[in-house]
């Protein structure tokens, strides 16, 4: 029984246990199947943000899984994923379970715990995530969030379209305005050469191209309107290579000037045909597109990439182009998605682009694992840091301090004026003490105290510098810090937190200082290192500092203690080639004036020391060619050394064969063996061959379209002795494609307008040739009437620094507007000076001679009569008792010296003594200003005497006038001299038939000084004198109108005499200078010259010879017989020391009418009425003189 029961019990137990076991198996299988069936792991995700997980997450993922998530973003966006949770089976090389992320250019493989918290960015707009698990050992898997992050075109270059189906154009929302000038800048790289290439086009509303930049059979051309403007001499097709290079094009309709900025240098040319076109609005701007030719677009577009295309509606200057940065926005079109319609397939993200955001590479050791299990097998992910101001880079590979600036506004209701920085600092540190992030306070400062309505309450603003010790590579956003502070306990001590804001401290922006040292954008307290210039084997350093006053970042000064400069280079025969290569590399960069001088000096040292073979000579020529690209201002100080170095170079070159030519972009030198026994003359020419950019030399004949031709006559060696002829072995030839090295500081008002060629026979000086050397040189710019002058570079001029000299050279009769032929009786550097200012057209040689004759005759007469006026008033004491006479004496003195200095100026200028010329110019300037000033003082005296209502006594009246009349001009001239003595010097005026200045003159050279101290100064005095002239004439005419004892004719004559008298006394005739412009300029120049050169004569006539009191003094002391005036005449009894106010009537008499026959009795009565200088009179005619 027991056995039976026991058996049934075991059977029941087994059946129930088996059922439960089977049920559990079924449930387990059902759950597994449900997990697998409910999780989709092969999907395409296109939402702007979201997340996905491994199957069954957070439970263990199933075995043998294979999943693929494709995250697709629109063009202009990248994909960013973050591993919120990650746990896979660990294994070396992730050979079992793994996640593979394809970012676009590289793959990253993860397993174990390594990816937890990691953020990755795609390089394009697609990212793929693959997950694979094997048959055993499952973990909980992963949870990944993703989002689309907008990126600018700064990170992307665009592939030039290879088919007409691909259109890269400006968006429809962008309207192209009417363009009469433009600047286009972009970066470009070529992958393959084509016969014709189009880079960009602009078409009008009808689809017709009105602007295109392209390569044609004629080279690089800019198509404007309907004209082709060649820029092949500025930029060749070979300059566009596989390396991305910036390029800017400018155009101005008014001048037809086309500029090209490439490789850090600016070149320009004139395209006159483009001046008639205006680019109409409403056009379509395309990258590539249909150019000006009829070639199929598929065959015409350039093969390569374009980047950072920007357009402005004005033409930038070279200085503006050189200062362009990535942040300079095109005001018509900019490199931004909002301006362009570009297919995503045409864009490529490239971290090497010049304006791309910072790129950081995550190294394999970033995840950090000691055992090696679960470490990434391959991890070469490139992660782009999105350029924002409030996002910390999530891919930081080093534990560095991150700085925040916090602004706290606190209300103090306890102590109004206290500084609570210590209390707030303690509160901040306590707040962050037990936080999960390591944050501490590095500084705090009180910025502002505002008194509120209640006297005991103030609102205070504090700035705090917070430092986050980032030891876990975990982001800390500003909002988290703000939230922490707002939720913190109260500050206490009567302080209440009103508001708080937290901002990530700005980085120090990318900077170039000094030249050649480019510092990348840097985080605060980080020190950057860049290679030294020119020696790049050492580094300079610079630290991004924190301003402790306002907690902003700034760059400290660079530390270049480890760097050495160019002057430290040691030159010897052994290292000459190495030094030359170094200097060529240095000169290929933009050099400052100081650096350029150092390079040229070192080249001169090298040429003097080394043996010059063809290879070394070629390198030296390259250096000088690079120097010639620098600004003319930078070349000025180095030109003498550079030219002498080239001269020495061609003398020392060792060569085999009949000749040697060394070419570069801006300089070509040639040396040819000379057979003195069979020399019958020679022709040397410089030209640019087809499909080349560097000039060449032909020693045998005149090349077609030669830039310069030198023909040496058969009699060239005739003046050499036999011993000299035996030593002659070579003919040297040099062609300079740029003229910056030939800067004449005393250029006679002329401008160099040709290439420069130089030729020599050995190192001998050849001059006084029987037959001249014929030099034919092309002009740099076309001119209808060039008026050329042939000159050569004379090293003996200007203290041996060199200058232009025309001795022994003349212009050939077969010269034209494009080329000039020079005939010279010696050999040296030759060029053509040309009057490009067109000043010679205003006054021709004939008129210039006439004006010069009038000026010298007039100034001589004026000086004589100014002296006569002065002597008259000095000789007769009674004439100089009144104020007007004393003022007139000062004015006559000033005019006398002005005319005398002017007459001596041209003669003294011919002595070529700089100090003497400066002295003469200073005195001429001074006496011109004193003349203006005393004319102004004349009008001021009239104002005081005529306009003031009551009698006036001014203490030391004439002394004060003298201080102003002589002191103000002296102060002005003194200031000019103190600022720069070079403001004065010798200049040339007028032009002769040979283009030379016909008149040497010591005068003001600086136009700013001239216009400020002469033109502006005189303008002020002139306007004042005009106003006074009008007032005086109104008073005189009003008085004359009340007189009934004169006829109308007499009144008119008296008024006319007053007008003429005042006109010359107040210098009104100097105003003719304001009208010497345009077609009437010559007429007013004659009027100006005649009247102003004779001003002293007119003053003598009207204010001395025709004055009745002067005539009486002359008659009394200088005449005899009947003409002599008796001593007992009315005049001899009349006092003249009048110090009262002049009536309008008497003023008119004293200035004009009294000189033309006013009665003696009338004048005498007026004088007697005012004998007492301090008496008060009710009579309106009382006077103050």
Swiss-Prot record:
Its main location: membrane. InterPro entries: ConA-like_dom_sf, CUB_dom, GAIN_B, GAIN_dom_sf, GPCR_2-like_7TM, GPCR_2_secretin-like, GPCR_2_secretin-like_CS, GPS. The chain crosses the membrane at residues 850-870, 887-907, 916-936, 958-978, 1014-1034, 1058-1080, 1084-1106. It comes from the Eukaryota. It is found in: Cell membrane. Residues 658-840 form the GAIN-B domain. The record marks 827-828 as: Cleavage. Keywords: Cell membrane, Disulfide bond, G-protein coupled receptor, Glycoprotein, Membrane, Receptor, Signal, Transducer, Transmembrane, Transmembrane helix. Residues 871-886, 937-957, 1035-1057, 1107-1185 are cytoplasmic. Ca(2+) binds at residues 89, 97, 134, 136-137. Residues 829-837 are annotated as: Stachel. Residues 41-354 are annotated as: Mediates interaction with type IV collagen. Disulfide bonds join 41-67, 94-111, 185-248, 229-271, 369-375, 508-544, 532-563, 790-822, 809-824. GO terms for cellular component: plasma membrane. Residues 790-840 are annotated as: GPS. Pfam families: 7tm_2 (PF00002), CUB (PF00431), GPS (PF01825), Pentaxin (PF00354), SEA_Gpr126 (PF25307). Belongs to the G-protein coupled receptor 2 family. Adhesion G-protein coupled receptor (ADGR) subfamily. This is Adhesion G-protein coupled receptor G6. The gene is adgrg6.
């Amino acid at each position: 029984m027991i056995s039976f029961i026991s058996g049934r019990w075991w059977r029941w137990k087994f059946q129930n246990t088996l059922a439960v076991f089977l049920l559990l198996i079924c449930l387990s299988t059902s759950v597994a199947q449900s997990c697998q069936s409910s999780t989709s792991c092969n999907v395409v995700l296109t939402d702007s943000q979201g997340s996905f997980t491994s199957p069954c997450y957070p439970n263990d993922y199933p075995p043998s899984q294979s999943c693929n998530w494709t995250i697709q973003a629109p063009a202009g966006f990248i994909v960013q994923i973050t591993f919120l949770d990650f746990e896979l089976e660990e294994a070396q090389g992730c050979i079992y379970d793994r996640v593979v992320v394809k970012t676009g250019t590289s793959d990253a493989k993860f397993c174990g715990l390594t990816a937890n918290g990691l953020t990755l960015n795609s390089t394009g707009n697609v990212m793929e995530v693959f997950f694979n698990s094997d048959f055993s050992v499952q973990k909980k898997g992963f949870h990944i969030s993703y989002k689309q992050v907008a990126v600018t075109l700064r990170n992307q270059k665009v592939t030039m379209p290879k088919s007409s189906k691909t259109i890269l154009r400006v968006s429809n929302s962008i309207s192209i305005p009417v363009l009469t000038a433009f600047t286009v800048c972009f970066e470009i790289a070529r992958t393959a050469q084509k016969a014709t290439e189009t880079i960009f086009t602009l078409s009008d509303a009808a689809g017709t191209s009105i602007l295109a930049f392209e390569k044609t059979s004629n080279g690089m051309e800019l198509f404007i309107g309907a004209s082709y403007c060649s820029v092949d001499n500025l930029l060749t097709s070979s300059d566009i290579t596989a390396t991305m290079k910036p390029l800017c094009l400018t155009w101005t309709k008014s001048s037809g000037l086309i500029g090209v900025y490439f490789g850090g240098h600016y070149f320009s040319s004139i395209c006159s045909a483009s001046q008639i076109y205006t680019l109409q609005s409403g056009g379509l701007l395309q990258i590539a597109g249909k150019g000006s030719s009829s070639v199929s677009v598929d065959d015409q577009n350039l093969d390569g990439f374009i980047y950072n295309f920007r357009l402005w509606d004005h033409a930038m200057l070279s200085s503006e182009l050189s200062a362009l940065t990535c942040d300079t926005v095109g005001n018509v079109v900019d490199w931004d998605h909002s301006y362009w319609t570009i297919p995503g397939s045409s864009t490529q993200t490239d971290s090497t682009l010049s304006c791309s955001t910072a790129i950081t590479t995550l190294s394999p050791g970033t995840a950090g694992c000691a055992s090696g299990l679960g470490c990434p097998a391959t991890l070469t992910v490139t992660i782009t840091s999105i350029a924002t101001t409030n996002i910390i880079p999530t891919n930081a590979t080093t534990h560095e301090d991150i700085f925040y600036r916090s602004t706290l506004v606190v209300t103090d209701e306890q102590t109004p004026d206290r500084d609570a920085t210590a209390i707030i600092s303690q509160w901040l540190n306590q707040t962050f003490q037990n936080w999960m992030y390591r944050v501490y306070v590095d500084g705090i400062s009180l910025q502002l105290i505002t008194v509120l309505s209640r006297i005991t309450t103030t609102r205070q603003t504090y700035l705090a510098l917070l430092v986050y010790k980032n030891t876990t590579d975990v982001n800390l956003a500003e909002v988290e810090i703000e939230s922490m502070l707002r939720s913190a306990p109260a500050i206490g001590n009567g302080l209440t937190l009103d508001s708080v804001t937290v901002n990530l401290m700005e980085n120090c922006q990318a900077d170039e200082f000094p030249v050649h040292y480019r510092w990348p954008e840097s985080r605060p307290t980080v020190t950057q290192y860049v290679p030294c210039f020119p020696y790049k084997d050492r580094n300079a350093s610079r630290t991004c500092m924190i301003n402790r006053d306002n907690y902003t970042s700034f760059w400290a000064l660079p530390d270049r203690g480890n760097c050495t400069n160019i002057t430290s280079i040691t030159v010897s025969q052994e290292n000459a080639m190495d030094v030359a290569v170094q200097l060529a590399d240095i000169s290929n960069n933009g050099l400052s004036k100081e650096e350029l001088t150092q390079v040229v000096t070192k080249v001169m040292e090298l040429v003097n020391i080394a043996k010059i073979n063809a290879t070394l000579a070629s390198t030296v020529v390259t250096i000088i060619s690079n120097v010639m690209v620098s600004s003319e201002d930078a070349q000025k100080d180095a030109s003498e050394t550079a030219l002498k170095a080239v001269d020495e170079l061609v003398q020392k070159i060792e060569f085999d064969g009949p000749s040697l030519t060394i070419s570069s972009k801006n300089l070509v030198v040639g040396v040819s063996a000379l057979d003195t026994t069979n020399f019958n003359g020679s022709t040397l020419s410089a030209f640019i061959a087809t499909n080349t950019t560097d000039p060449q030399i032909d020693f045998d004949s005149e090349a077609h379209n030669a830039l310069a031709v030198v023909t040496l006559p058969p009699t060239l060696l005739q003046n050499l002795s036999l011993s000299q002829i035996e030593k002659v072995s070579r003919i040297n030839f040099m062609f300079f494609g740029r003229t910056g090295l030939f800067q004449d500081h005393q250029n006679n008002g002329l401008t160099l307008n040709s290439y420069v060629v130089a030729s020599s026979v050995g190192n001998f000086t050849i001059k006084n040739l029987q037959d001249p050397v014929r030099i034919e040189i092309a002009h740099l710019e076309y001119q209808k009437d060039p008026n050329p002058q042939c000159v050569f570079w004379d090293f003996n001029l200007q203290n041996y620094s060199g200058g232009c000299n025309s001795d022994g050279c003349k212009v050939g009769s077969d010269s034209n507007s494009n080329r000039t032929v020079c005939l010279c009786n010696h050999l040296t550097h030759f060029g053509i000076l040309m009057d490009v200012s067109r000043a010679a057209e205003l006054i021709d040689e004939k008129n210039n001679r006439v004006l010069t004759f009038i000026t010298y005759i007039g100034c001589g007469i004026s000086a004589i009569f100014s002296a006569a006026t002065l002597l008259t008033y000095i000789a007769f004491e009674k004439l100089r008792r009144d104020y007007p006479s004393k003022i007139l004496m000062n004015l006559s003195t000033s005019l006398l010296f002005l005319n005398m200095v002017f007459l001596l100026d041209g003669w003294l200028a011919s002595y070529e003594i700089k100090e003497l010329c400066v002295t003469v110019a200073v005195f001429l300037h001074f006496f011109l200003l004193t003349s203006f000033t005393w004319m102004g003082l004349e009008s001021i005296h009239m104002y005081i005497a005529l306009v003031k209502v009551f009698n006036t006594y001014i203490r030391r009246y004439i002394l004060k006038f003298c201080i102003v009349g002589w002191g103000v001009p002296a102060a002005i001239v003194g200031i000019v001299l103190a600022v720069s003595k070079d403001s004065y010097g010798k200049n040339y005026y007028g032009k002769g038939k040979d283009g030379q200045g016909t008149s040497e003159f010591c005068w003001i050279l600086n136009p700013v000084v001239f216009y400020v101290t002469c033109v502006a100064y005189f303008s002020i005095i002139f306007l004042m004198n005009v106003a006074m002239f009008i007032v005086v004439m109104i008073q005189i005419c009003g008085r004359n109108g009340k007189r009934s004892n004169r006829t109308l004719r007499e009144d008119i004559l008296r008024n006319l005499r007053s007008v003429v008298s005042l006109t010359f006394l107040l210098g009104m005739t100097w105003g003719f200078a304001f009208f010497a412009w345009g077609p009437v300029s010559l007429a007013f120049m004659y009027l100006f010259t005649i009247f102003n050169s004779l001003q002293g004569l007119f003053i003598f006539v009207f204010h001395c010879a025709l004055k009745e009191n002067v005539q009486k003094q002359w008659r009394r002391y200088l005449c005899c017989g009947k003409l002599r005036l008796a001593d007992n005449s009315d005049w001899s009894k009349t006092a003249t020391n009048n110090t009262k106010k002049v009536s309008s009537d008497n003023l008119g008499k004293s200035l004009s009418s009294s000189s033309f026959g006013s009665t003696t009795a009338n004048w005498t009565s007026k004088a007697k009425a005012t004998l007492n200088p301090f008496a008060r009179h009710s009579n309106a005619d009382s006077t103050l003189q």
